[in-house]
A protein has these predicted regions:
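Sec-dependent signal peptide recognition
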Residues: 3, 17-25
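Sec/Tat signal peptide C-region and signal peptidase I cleavage site
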Residues: 15, 32-36
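Immediate post-signal peptide segment of exported/extracytoplasmic ligand-binding proteins
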Residues: 35-45, 72-74, 165-170
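Periplasmic-binding protein-like
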Residues: 45, 95, 99-108, 128-130, ...
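Glycine- and acidic-residue-enriched helix-capping/strand-helix junction motifs
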Residues: 50-62, 180-187
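Extracellular/periplasmic Venus flytrap/periplasmic-binding protein
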Residues: 90, 135-136, 144-236
Length: 236
């Protein structure tokens, strides 16, 4: 629905005030299958399709393509960011400047989102985030053209911190990868957890061997462990 709303807004040139007043009507309509001027909306999907974390990107791509299947008013350009911020920036620049996309989407990793989203929205393009939700893009850092259709990174982990309290845990060992989403995760947990920390570790992004960290956890005396290890990093 959010994509359809943005498409309607783009086509009709709605200002923000008019957009907000017609939002409910657009949701009820639930369809943007016909456009008066025949404009075909271009969507640029930059996501991780190879290497570590590609499973998440593939799922996002497949789900998105299923949602727009059969819609002749939407064209989608899909590219692999290889989980590299510099590649993501290059792809976004090309899609905006050369391909003339109207909407960008697809990024999984928050460090890539921080590299791409600000420049995208500041050029008047819409960005729909299907996964990455850096806290720096919320609140005072939010932009009217940025829509996070997943979550803000720290929200889920705040709930985990609250649960740890209700479960009676007093001494947590916490760890996450050293990148924006990892930092948001542990910040969110600590925001609501009222106990003490037996340890706090930021691992390398993409790391899969945690023998050293497990040894530290065993020696720490922690009564609980909270970790955020997305994608392939959490399998092993």
């Amino acid at each position: 629905y959010i994509l359809l709303i943005l498409i309607q807004r783009f086509i009709r040139g709605l200002n923000m005030k008019k957009f907000t007043t017609t939002l409910a009507a657009l949701l009820i309509m639930g369809s943007a299958s016909s456009f008066a001027d025949g404009h075909k909306v271009k969507v640029g999907m930059i996501t991780t399709l190879s290497g570590g974390g590609s499973g998440l990107g593939i799922d996002v791509r497949d789900g998105f393509m299923l949602a727009v299947k059969g819609n002749k008013n939407i064209s989608v350009i899909t590219k692999d960011d290889q989980r590299k911020p510099d590649i993501a920036v290059q792809l976004a620049d090309k899609m905006i400047q050369s391909d003339k996309v109207d909407v960008l989407t697809g990024i999984i990793w928050s460090n890539l989102a921080m590299a791409v989203v600000p420049a995208t929205v500041n050029q008047g393009k819409f960005y729909l985030s299907p996964n990455a939700g850096p806290s720096k893009l919320a609140g005072k850092g939010c932009h009217k053209n940025y829509f996070n259709v997943a979550w803000q990174n720290d929200n889920l982990h705040e709930a985990a911190g609250g649960y740890a309290n209700s479960a009676g845990f007093k001494n947590s060992f916490i760890l996450a990868p050293n990148y924006p989403a990892g930092k948001d995760a542990l910040t969110g947990y600590k925001r609501y957890f009222k106990g003490s920390l037996a340890g706090e570790i930021y691992t390398k992004l993409g790391q899969k061997d945690y023998a050293a960290e497990i040894a530290q956890i065993r020696a720490s005396g922690a009564d609980s462990v909270f970790f955020f290890l997305p994608g392939g990093m959490g399998i092993g």
